[in-house]
Amino acid sequence: MGQKVNPHGFRLGITTEFSSRWYADRMYRDYVKEDVAIRRMMTRGMERAGISRVEIERTRDRVRVDIHTARPGIVIGRRGAEADRIRADLEKLTNKQVQLNILEVKNPEIDAQLVAQGVAEQLSQRVSFRRAMRKALQSALKAGAKGVRVQVAGRLGGAEMSRTEFYREGRVPLHTLRADIDYGFYEARTTFGRIGVKVWIYKGDVVAGRDHEAARVAARVQQRAVRGRSARREQPAAESPALETAAPAVAEPGAAAAPAAAGADVPVVADTAPAGQGAAERPVAEQPVVTAEPAAAAAVTGETGTGGSNAAPAEPTTSAAAEEAPGGADAPSDATETKEG
């Protein structure tokens, strides 16, 4: 199928674009006829200008015509006289305001339409078709084309029987949709009849359509990931003052080392006493435990009730008395002496 179909229409929307860009409902037929008439006017009146293609874009009250040519000076004319004439003819044909843009083809040696037109002009001047084809091949390959195929058909050399001959150099993958293949056709008028010239030029593969969209989406995702990483790097720096203010509330180094060494989770009880009267936080396992007999406990309670809050230094004496109480029979007398004193 790729050998027979027009390469431009076969790859439309993949590597090639529409030559006419407009939308119409009822006027569709009239617009198509106008486009054909515009292109016919450009090709017939200016064969020497080397026009490659004509792009047409329509709006409600304006028509934009882009002319791609290898010789813009011929299209513009002296002081723009030729361009003004073309614009006037187009406005008369379309009955609308016409915006005319003349664009230069940077590399005409690899433009298929211009190459076909050049070969046809040489055939019209009775140049050998083989020489014209080989010259076109060499110039296109030197200009950077990866593959070229030139085909001529008709009464070649004035023969009574028409035939088709072609020359090819490099790769011309007509079945590959991603291949950027330019196609051109032109007819040479000779004394023996018309000779058709077709040119295929392979310029390389083009990433388009879904592949291009997937690459664009991947780039957006990568940008978002980079932004997220930068935000994460800036977040600890913003929270560092809060960590510094909470640092004084951490337990003492000796107290914090014991639970970590034991390997168990020890609940921490926060001290609600005012500052200066106790530790801020202390593990439950390290809280002082007072073990005393009922009598000693009553004595301590009595002293605490009479002494008030200043009786806190008496805890070491009470704990010492509690440790000596189970030792012998003199424990009650010691407790009595302590109470009398």
UniProtKB/Swiss-Prot annotation:
Residues 224-246, 274-341 are annotated as: Disordered. Keywords: Ribonucleoprotein, Ribosomal protein, RNA-binding, rRNA-binding. The lineage of its organism: Bacteria, Bacillati, Actinomycetota, Actinomycetes, Acidothermales. GO terms for cellular component: cytosolic small ribosomal subunit. Part of the 30S ribosomal subunit. Forms a tight complex with proteins S10 and S14. PROSITE patterns: KH_TYPE_2, RIBOSOMAL_S3. This is Small ribosomal subunit protein uS3. Belongs to the universal ribosomal protein uS3 family. One of its GO terms (biological process) is translation. InterPro entries: KH_dom (IPR004087), KH_dom-like_a/b (IPR015946), KH_dom_type_2 (IPR004044), KH_sf_prok-type (IPR009019), Ribosomal_S3_C_sf (IPR036419), Ribosomal_uS3_bac-typ (IPR005704), Ribosomal_uS3_C (IPR001351), Ribosomal_uS3_CS (IPR018280). It comes from the Bacteria. Binds the lower part of the 30S subunit head. Binds mRNA in the 70S ribosome, positioning it for translation. Residues 38-106 form the KH type-2 domain. Signal peptide: none annotated. One of its GO terms (molecular function) is mRNA binding. Residues 285-303, 311-333 have a biased composition (Low complexity). The keyword Ribonucleoprotein applies.
